[in-house]
């Protein structure tokens, strides 16, 4: 991102008066949460890279795919949330503007939008272009809106463009901390603003990260999951030529976790240096079971140049049972009365066993269930793993 900064992500799981994440920060986030529940109908989160990917993971885990179709009561008062700024796509943005316009027409003059614009420099092309188009569209349609800016607040003498805009227009502001790259920023206000606006358990998320941080300080490699992962992947790359990593959680709620990991791995290992040879792996985002019908044949029968990283959730919230409604068809009989999430995990196990039986490198991380605590564990483990590697 320009000049080198210290790497301070290891401080992020802890709330302290003199830390990066403070009690005062949490208080402001909870005030934002309570305000939005009573005053905001729709949030549009505008950002790219680390200013988008971690927030999207939080949204997907907390809200799921159909959040914006629920009633206000079903959302417990929390606003709808859409994302923009992660690309410069006029068709996508026009569709979003039309959606906001329709919602405003349906509710009337009480309808209100919150634009959350996140940019460290305040001049990143994609989010700022999207933001300016969205703001003008809301103004032209007389739709009530307010702006929250998340940007670098560290330099009072040379404020970012976005911070200057926020001061001039009296917008609420939150901070992108010094020493925390975008790939780690989900554990800061960058991710927490989104978290607060949809009712995600921020303190549970940090507790999971802190639990994993403690494990990652263990000197015994077999008690340190991040160090073990880093060592195995390094050996796989340098000794066995496994220079591609397929990151493959099973379940739609974790689809965006793959995209987040692609950035984390790429920006952490893809470094130019005058003191060492180039190193890294090419990350490939995948999701099960969908990509079992797209990528997996190549994983199982293609070149021996990949490691596959699975993420498994043991118990899902809604293990819907397949009804035994077409049992006269022999090939469908086995599905009757089986939980659909059981099918998901059986598919993962079968994929893993097929790879292992052919000496194709893979590893599986299993969590008991998917919640804020275990998500914090998963994400912080991978932060430490790329650091160790």
Question: Which residues fall in each region the model found?
Answer:
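Glycine-rich phosphate/diphosphate-binding loops that line cofactor/substrate pockets in enzymes
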Residues: 28-41, 97-112, 231-243, 299-304
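Glycine-rich phosphate-binding loops that contact phosphosugars or nucleotide phosphates
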Residues: 34-219
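C-terminal helical/tail subdomains of lipid-metabolizing enzymes
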Residues: 363-389
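A gly/proline- and charged-residue-enriched helix-loop-helix capping module
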Residues: 89-91, 233, 330
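Helicase-primase coupling helices
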Residues: 284-370
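Active-site phosphate/pyrophosphate-binding segments
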Residues: 139-309, 314-318
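Extended, charge-enriched "interface" segments that sit outside catalytic cores
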Residues: 1-37, 325-330, 334
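Short, solvent-exposed amphipathic alpha-helical segments in soluble enzyme
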Residues: 58-63, 98-100, 131-134, 166-168, ...
């Amino acid at each position: 991102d320009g000049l080198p900064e210290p790497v301070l992500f290891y401080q992020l799981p802890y709330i302290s008066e003199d830390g990066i994440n403070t009690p005062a920060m949490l208080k402001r986030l909870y005030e934002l949460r309570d305000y939005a529940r009573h005053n905001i109908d729709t949030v549009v989160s505008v950002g790219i890279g680390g200013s988008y990917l971690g927030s999207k993971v939080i949204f997907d885990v907390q809200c799921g795919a159909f959040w914006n179709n629920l009633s206000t009561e079903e959302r417990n008062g929390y606003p709808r949330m859409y994302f923009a700024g992660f690309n410069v796509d006029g068709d996508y943005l026009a569709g979003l503007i039309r959606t906001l316009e329709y919602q405003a027409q349906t509710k009337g003059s009480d309808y209100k939008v919150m634009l959350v614009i996140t940019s460290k420099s305040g001049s990143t092309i994609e989010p700022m272009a999207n933001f300016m188009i969205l703001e003008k569209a809301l103004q032209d349609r007389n739709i009530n809106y307010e702006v929250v800016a998340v940007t670098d607040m560290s330099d009072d003498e040379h404020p970012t463009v976005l911070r200057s805009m926020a001061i001039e227009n009296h917008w609420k502001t939150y901070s992108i901390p010094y020493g925390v790259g975008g790939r780690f920023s989900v554990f800061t206000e960058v991710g927490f603003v989104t978290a607060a606006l949809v009712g995600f358990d921020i303190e549970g998320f940090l507790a999971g990260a802190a639990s994993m941080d403690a494990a990652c300080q263990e000197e015994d490699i077999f008690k340190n999951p991040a160090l073990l992962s880093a060592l195995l992947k390094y050996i796989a790359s340098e000794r066995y030529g496994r220079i591609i990593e397929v990151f493959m959680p099973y379940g739609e709620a974790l689809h965006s976790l793959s995209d987040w990991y692609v950035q984390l791995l790429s920006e952490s290992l893809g470094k130019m240096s005058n003191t060492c040879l180039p190193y890294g792996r090419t990350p490939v985002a995948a999701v099960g079971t969908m990509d079992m019908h797209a990528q997996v044949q190549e994983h199982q029968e293609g070149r021996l140049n990949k490691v596959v990283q699975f993420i498994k959730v043991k118990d899902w919230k809604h293990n819907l049972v397949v009804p035994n409604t077409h049992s006269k068809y022999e090939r469908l009989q086995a599905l009757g009365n089986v939980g659909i999430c059981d099918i998901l995990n059986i598919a993962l196990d079968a994929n893993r066993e097929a790879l292992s039986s052919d000496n194709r490198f893979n590893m599986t991380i299993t969590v008991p269930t998917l919640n804020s605590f275990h998500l914090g564990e998963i994400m912080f483990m991978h932060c430490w793993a790329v650091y160790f590697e």
